[in-house]
Amino acid sequence: MSPVVSPDGRYLAFLRVRTVGRVAIFLLPLTSGPAPSGTPRQLTDDDPGVIGVAWTADGRDLVFSSGGHLGLSRTAKISAAPQSSRTPEPEFLTFGEQATAISIAGTGRLVYSAQFRDSALYELALPARPATPVALAAFSSTFDEQTPHYSPDGQRLAFASTRSGTEEIWIANRDGSKPLQVTSMGGPQCSNPQWSPDGSEILFNSRRAGSGDLYLLRPETGKLTRLTDHPASEGEARWSRDGRWIYFGSNRTGRDEVWRMPAAGGPPIQITRNGGAAAIESGDGFLYYSNHTASPSSIWRVPVDGGSEVRIVDGLSYSINFAVGERGLYFVAIGDTADKPSLDFFDVATGQRSTLVRLDKPFWFGMALAPGERSLLLSLVDSAGSNLMLVDRFP
């Protein structure tokens, strides 16, 4: 993707995606036709992934932006000259933080788009009427905070944040104070932390080793255990209520389905047959999940041990933006437009759906229900946008 031909027409530079967050620059020689001449040569590593690329006016170098998934990106310059033995080292530039698209004129003027986004965790006391979500003041980061989860005693939070420059797992007190980074995976994606029912471990997914695998972390000791090692992409994992099983989404069959594996390790068992992800076990023996192929924006239900799949409610904003309570489902719903979401509740026994609160900010990734259903955590976008930046007389 993002093909750009060198000023002299001899090379085509392009980006090749291996998986989310892992993107590298490749160079392909061209004939005067133009037509491919030879095989593409990889010019950069794919971790951190490349976002945008442009040729310098003299055609000797490429300028690009790279960074982890949702994390901090930087601009760099790398030689396009053939290398006899090793990949050239990029030279990081003094400008271009959060750059995406890059363009360089023949006169040497460079322009790029600098994007920004600040998402934060908001807590909503339950019952919600007529309250509104309140930001956790201790979260002072200007980067992303997302996919939150309460500890079993409700006193601590686990969440993903890009405040260190790459997406990592953090823990904090319930009010957001004393945040502590507990992973150092280095990108490109590290997300969806879930406390174990006994509070001793945190389950999460990371793409550090490729397409996506599940990991267990003991935050008190820092011990990290890799649970899955499969070419497929696996994530959005949740514990069973007794802590003996782990439910997760995997595309190992060719599409996303819900699978279950022993928490202590062992072969997984496929649960859904028509698409699924982000499964949560209820107290009455069902799994509630999203991403069914017949209706991806709906929440579905299937017995824990497998059986008939039933659509429960429509309008889910994103696959992990729901929680299962004792009486029903809390979920971030899409309003008339995507920028007008609401927090809704669906009573499973009566089939009644109600809106708890209209959200005045765009939704982001993840939500969590506190023990005892005293409150909900949401990730909402405080600000987002982009600016065009001009660099004169480059390089």
Predicted regions and their residues:
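Short glycine/acidic-enriched loop and turn motifs that connect beta-strands
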Residues: R18-G21, G68-G71, F116-D118, R163-T166, ...
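Predominantly a core beta-strand signature of beta-propeller blades
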Residues: G38-R41, T87-E91, P130-L136, S177-Q181, ...
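Blade-level signature of beta-propeller repeat domains, shared across WD40, Kelch, NHL, RCC1
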Residues: L121, G366-P395
